[in-house]
Swiss-Prot record:
Similarity field: Belongs to the FliW family.
Cellular compartment(s): Cytoplasm
Oligomeric and partner information: Interacts with translational regulator CsrA and flagellin(s).
Protein name: Flagellar assembly factor FliW
C-alpha cells in the first residue's frame, strides 16, 4: 500500500459527492488493514483499504485515461484503495465500494475516484463472508 505513516495527496477532481475537497492525507489506522483518508481541513474522512486484502482476484478494469489523469504510467506508481462502509448496528456487516475505487499515484501524490467498468462489482461488497 502506502508505506509512510501519513502522506498528503491532491485529488484535482475531488471524490464523488465531495468534489470541492481536493486535498487528503492517508494515515495508518490502529485497525489493520484499514487506513484513514482524511481531508486536510478534517471535515471529511473515509475508512479505506486495499481491495486485495479481502478479494485477491479483484480486477476492476480501470480505464487507462483514469491512470493518465493522475500521471500513473508505471505499475509501481499505482495503488488501488476502496472506501469501506461500517454499519452501526452490525460491525460484521462491513462493505466495500468496489465499483468506484480510489486510485493513487504514490510517486506524484495524485489521486482520483475511478469508476470500475467490471459489472460484477458493487458499491456494497461484503468484506466478511459468513
Amino acid at each position: 500500500m502506502i508505506n509512510e505513516k501519513s502522506i498528503g495527496f491532491d485529488f484535482p477532481e475531488g471524490i464523488l459527492g465531495f468534489e470541492n475537497i481536493k486535498k487528503f492525507i492517508i494515515k495508518d489506522s490502529k485497525y489493520k488493514p484499514f487506513s484513514i483518508m482524511q481531508s486536510i481541513n478534517k471535515e471529511v474522512s473515509f475508512l479505506v483499504t486495499s481491495p486485495f486484502n479481502f478479494l485477491s482476484e479483484y480486477l476492476p478494469n480501470i480505464q487507462e485515461k483514469d491512470w493518465s489523469d493522475i500521471k500513473a504510467k508505471e505499475e509501481d506508481e499505482r495503488v488501488i484503495l476502496c472506501i469501506i462502509n461500517m454499519h452501526v448496528n452490525d460491525y460484521k456487516d462491513i462493505t466495500a465500494n468496489l465499483k468506484a475505487p480510489i486510485i493513487i499515484n504514490k510517486k506524484k501524490l495524485l489521486g482520483k475516484q475511478a469508476i470500475c467498468t467490471n459489472e460484477k462489482y458493487s458499491l456494497h461488497h461484503k468484506v466478511f463472508k459468513e
